Amino acid sequence: MKKVIVITGPTSSGKTDLSIYLAKKFDGEIINSDSVQIYKKYNIGSAKITFAEQKSIKHHLLDLKEPDEVYTIYDFQRDCRKIISNVRLPFLVGGSGLYIKSALFNYELSNKKNTSIIYKNDKKVYDVDDMEFMIREIRQKDPKLVFDKYNPRRVVSAYLDLNSDKLRSQKKYKNNPIYDILTIYLDIDKNILQARVIERLEKMFKMGFIEETKQILQEYPYANFNIIGYREIKLFLEKKINLTEAKKLIISKTMNYAKKQKTWFKNQMKINVINVLDSKLKIKTFQIIKNFLKGAVYD
């Protein structure tokens, strides 16, 4: 089977720096696996890698869509698999576990675009209460379904599927890999992670996080703002909360998401856990990948 390497972990764990180093060492290419970074304009708030930071390493699925365009997990699965087939050694880098697993395992996803009608043609944007209702319904009626509750389009799609002849969890998801996968999970103590998150957030504000959110709101009023960081800044701009409250919410939700993220990867994929603060981080990950590739056509 084709060998694929995954570099994942929470925000502020150093995925970008490590992936650039490893992709250079093994002559690989990087496939963005962060669902937000697929979209243009969400740069500061998603800590999107800059062109200069890419250091001539080929990156795929970055800045692919406008903020108000629909790009589903089905689209990612299709595009990612196509890239994998054409790349010598693909590195999937990001923290969107559902996206990563959909591309690497034999998930059968449908190409349904009905949610785009709800969001664009009708000019309808569901509010928080609507989202919470649909999430409760999905969990009650299809408790085995793994879905991204932070993405409203996917919540709506899963909710609409509740009325189909077969539950989505029963008909679409399987758990067999279609590639030979090595997953490196960058782990970090929660207190150190929180300090990093706070530091990064302050840096984002200095870089213009508020101005970026305001610009997206003005140019794409029907864009997805159900994203940690952008959602809270939007509330601040609407004068529903103050800046201190916005920052506290962003930090709290980021930490909660990181906790759930780790649990998800531990339960859903076989991972090699590496401590971010290990002084030999790059040496160890290099050796793990070298052993993984031993005997393959990459040597």
Curated annotation (Swiss-Prot):
Site feature Interaction with substrate tRNA, where: S96
InterPro entries reported for this sequence: Dimethylallyltransferase (IPR039657), IPT (IPR018022), P-loop_NTPase (IPR027417)
Recorded superkingdom: Bacteria
Catalyzed reactions: adenosine(37) in tRNA + dimethylallyl diphosphate = N(6)-dimethylallyladenosine(37) in tRNA + diphosphate
GO terms of biological process kind: tRNA modification
Binding site for ATP: G9, P10, T11, S12, S13, G14, K15, T16
EC number(s) reported in the record: 2.5.1.75
Annotated binding of substrate, by residue: T11, S12, S13, G14, K15, T16
Presence of keyword Membrane: no
Cofactor(s) the protein needs: Mg(2+)
PANTHER family: TRNA DIMETHYLALLYLTRANSFERASE (PTHR11088:SF60)
Function: Catalyzes the transfer of a dimethylallyl group onto the adenine at position 37 in tRNAs that read codons beginning with uridine, leading to the formation of N6-(dimethylallyl)adenosine (i(6)A).
Family from the record: Belongs to the IPP transferase family.
Protein's recorded name: tRNA dimethylallyltransferase
Gene assigned in the entry: miaA
